[in-house]
C-alpha cells in the first residue's frame, strides 16, 4: 500500500510539472469591468481577453478584435460559451493566430423599452457611445494607441 501511495505521489508530481510546461497552458486572462457612459447615462459592462505577454509588455501594440454578442445575450457569452480564452491560447501556441486583445462589449439595454442593440435609436444611442466613448477608452486602457489605430477599415 505504501508503495502505491508513493508511486501515485510521484506520478502526480511529474504530471503537474508537464502541465505547467505544456504549450497551451498560457497565463492569459479574461477581465470583466464597466465603463460609465455619458451618452447612455449608465454603466456599460465589457469583457476583455488579454494575451499572456500583456502583463510583461504593456507597451506592445496588440491588434484588437471586437466580438459582438447576439440578441438576448451579454458581454460574457464569448468567454462562457465561445471559450475565447481556451481557443485563443491554443491558436497562439500553435502559431495559427498572433497575440491579440479581444473585447466583447455589452449592448443590451432594457428589452421592454426597445433599448437594445448596437445602433442608435430613440432613447438608445449605443452606436454613438461605441465610437465616441468605448473605442477610445479601450484603446487608451489596453493598447496605448488611438482608437482608429486598433482596427482595420
Predicted regions: what they are:
Residues 19-62:
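A domain-start/cap signature at the N-terminus of enzymes
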Residues 68-75, 139-142:
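Cell-envelope and extracellular/periplasmic
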Residues 143-150:
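Conserved small/polar residues in nucleotide/adenosyl-binding loops
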Residues 60-70:
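Short beta-strand element of the alpha/beta-hydrolase
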Residues 80-82:
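Typically the conserved alpha-helix immediately C-terminal to a functionally engaged Cys/Sec
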Residues 1-21:
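Bacterial Sec-dependent N-terminal signal peptides
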Residues 74-77, 89, 96-129:
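Cap/lid segment of the alpha/beta-hydrolase catalytic domain
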Amino acid at each position: 500500500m505504501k508503495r502505491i501511495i508513493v508511486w501515485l505521489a510521484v506520478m502526480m508530481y511529474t504530471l503537474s510539472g508537464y502541465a505547467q510546461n505544456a504549450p497551451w497552458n498560457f497565463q492569459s486572462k479574461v477581465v470583466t469591468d464597466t465603463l460609465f457612459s455619458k451618452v447612455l447615462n449608465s454603466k456599460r459592462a465589457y469583457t476583455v481577453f488579454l494575451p499572456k505577454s500583456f502583463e510583461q509588455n504593456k507597451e506592445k501594440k496588440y491588434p484588437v478584435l471586437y466580438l459582438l454578442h447576439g440578441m438576448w445575450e451579454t458581454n460574457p457569452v464569448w468567454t462562457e460559451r465561445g471559450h475565447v480564452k481556451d481557443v485563443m491560447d491554443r491558436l497562439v501556441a500553435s502559431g495559427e493566430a498572433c497575440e491579440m486583445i479581444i473585447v466583447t462589449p455589452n449592448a443590451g439595454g432594457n428589452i421592454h423599452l426597445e433599448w437594445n442593440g448596437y445602433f442608435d435609436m430613440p432613447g438608445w444611442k449605443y452606436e454613438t457611445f461605441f465610437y465616441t466613448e468605448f473605442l477610445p477608452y479601450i484603446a487608451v486602457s489596453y493598447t496605448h494607441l488611438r482608437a482608429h489605430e486598433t482596427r482595420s477599415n
